[in-house]
Amino acid sequence: MFKQWEGFQDGEWTNDVNVRDFIQKNYKEYTGDKSFLKGPTEKTKKVWDKAVSLILEELKKGILDVDTETISGINSFKPGYLDKDNEVIVGFQTDAPLKRITNPFGGIRMAEQSLKEYGFKISDEMHNIFTNYRKTHNQGVFDAYSEETRIARSAGVLTGLPDAYGRGRIIGDYRRVALYGIDFLIQEKKKDLSNLKGDMLDELIRLREEVSEQIRALDEIKKMALSYGVDISRPAVNAKEAAQFLYFGYLAGVKENNGAAMSLGRTSTFLDIYIERDLEQGLITEDEAQEVIDQFIIKLRLVRHLRTPEYNELFAGDPTWVTESIAGVGIDGRSLVTKNSFRYLHTLINLGSAPEPNMTVLWSENLPESFKKFCAEMSILTDSIQYENDDIMRPIYGDDYAIACCVSAMRVGKDMQFFGARCNLAKCLLLAINGGVDEKKGIKVVPDIEPITDEVLDYEKVKENYFKVLEYMAGLYVNTMNIIHFMHDKYAYEASQMALHDTKVGRLMAFGIAGFSVAADSLSAIRYAKVKPIRENGITVDFVKEGDFPKYGNDDDRVDSIAVEIVEKFSDELKKHPTYRNAKHTLSVLTITSNVMYGKKTGTTPDGRKVGEPLAPGANPMHGRDMEGALASLNSVAKVPYVCCEDGVSNTFSIVPDALGNDHDVRINNLVSIMGGYFGQGAHHLNVNVLNRETLIDAMNNPDKYPTLTIRVSGYAVNFNRLSKDHQKEVISRTFHEKL
């Protein structure tokens, strides 16, 4: 045993890398209230004031600065500080806060476009290296893409794919750095490498190469930390070191990679063990414990990546998805709520509301009531928290999983994900009606589909064609994803993050869908109303609708059952096709903010949505159609089965404060009851916004009045001022429930 482990109860974790066992043996469940919490220290105030000044300057400029000379890497940059005298946790991606990295490994053209957008130019040397000598992920992907994939991508059926940006959604077990130190982790990886024996064929050769890269990455992380004067070769000795060591593990990931989602994992309960030991030994006070957490969170709030304009259309508001998964319940029935669960959420008060880190509460009916009420209060005050159903994820992933990006569960350090963007199911329906021809470009996208020529659309005929399109697109989607992730592993491998995984990991292939509610409502309109297509040159470009129809979002099984059938069908079709590295097929109903861009690529649909108008986000009902109140809307979404959508079912829920009650305590209790009822039905995810539409309209027109206004959008939170006008208008047009 290491001397740094004195005071901890031993177990399997002392012999093998097993952070879960360490947590289960050592954490202390907290069932009390928030009364112990402390405000920010003077050091924290000074550091945060300087950070806010830089953030506001960045907001005006778009980005603050970029290093155009240095190629991204774990230890490529000199140390950077914000306020060296007052920083309790140190480390930035580059040599200065908010200075962004140029990462050419995903694609040199993308890096150059990103720089050009903000008035910067890549260095001649970097351009030369990645144009003439070093192939990139993007080049590899497009070398291998089939013509069918290129057509579907261009038409906006398969789009937003991680072929032009880092895939992300990989969570290193950064806790391992604090618990074991880098030297022990290197030693364990070397043992693994020596045991990787057998017939030297593709998979074994690749894995041996990857583990060798992981060992080098661990050494680079150690060197990077030493540049800040911190020795992470051995385990952390106290809470401050544990947070710092863990952060260096995460920092290596965001220095090396610019993945779409660079999530943190499940760290609050882990760090609480160190804080409790220090408090018991009189080494720190509660003020100092909160200071460590506040300053750790400040660092996470300042993570940035360089993005293309096209990327910003997909993922609006400059998100990084530093997702932290909080609470949940252990397999033994004890909740994983600790005082540190409160401290993390309390940063939303000490530092003000913010979109990052992406605070995610793993909700269970067995969480302490005091914690449920605290979470609800924080949601009402800050609109910064999302909730995910631990009771349906725990049986699949155990009690040491975390959320990647928005809604995607995986076991920390044991699973990784191949992120797959999404397929536009609303567009697929138009392809079914038009015989596989794109309604906007007039090009053939899906072969062997006859156009529907009836004067009034027949539900059974349309559904038959629609399912044929879904069958074809599922196969094409899997093939496309296989190419992308083969090339990402080859040309943009995440060595630092994968070094903090078990050597033999589970892999999840994360497919997604957009236009879910539009597709369901459109089929409902065809079935229950009379829908006549309007054609130009044989292509349906509009619809005339007679009569009404049931709309998804009103707890009406006539249409909700159609919605469920769609996801079940697409999930089943995906699973018929083999995946790269035998990854498990998963599916999400999640759009991020790409529902606006997808809408621009999608023609008029039978439900009455007009050409170019946004789709609804995630699994949400279409804007304004959930007329029966908040509970009916939630009930519809709760019917979408997690069993066929294990990558997540995203629901963004906005309610005006008065609908929850006229008194603060009443609002808290009502919100707890709403979430209890929703998750009790097996629903998966809920973004919670408690605010008035008028506030957002005023913020759009007077942004200076609301410099830190944070809202939940689709699986993440965003600073409202960072959204484009199109995205702001789309958010404002969503349903704000005025009654339960």
Curated annotation (Swiss-Prot):
Keywords: Acyltransferase, Carbohydrate metabolism, Cytoplasm, Glucose metabolism, Organic radical, Transferase. It catalyses: formate + acetyl-CoA = pyruvate + CoA. The keyword Cell membrane does not apply. GO terms for biological process: glucose metabolic process. InterPro entries: Auton_GlycylRad_Cofactor (IPR050244), Form_AcTrfase (IPR005949), Form_AcTrfase_GR_CS (IPR019777), Gly_radical (IPR001150), PFL_dom (IPR004184). GO terms for molecular function: formate C-acetyltransferase activity. Residues 617-740 form the Glycine radical domain. The keyword Lyase does not apply. It comes from the Bacteria. GO terms for cellular component: cytosol. Residues 1-610 form the PFL domain. It is found in: Cytoplasm. Several mechanisms have been proposed based on complexes formed with substrate analogs. After activation by the glycine radical, the cysteine radical, Cys-406, can abstract hydrogen atoms from the other active site cysteine, Cys-405, and from coenzyme A, and it can also transfer hydrogen atoms to product radicals. The other active site cysteine can attack the central carbonyl of pyruvate and covalently bind the product acetyl group. Homodimer. Belongs to the glycyl radical enzyme (GRE) family. PFL subfamily. This is Formate acetyltransferase. It comes from Clostridium pasteurianum.
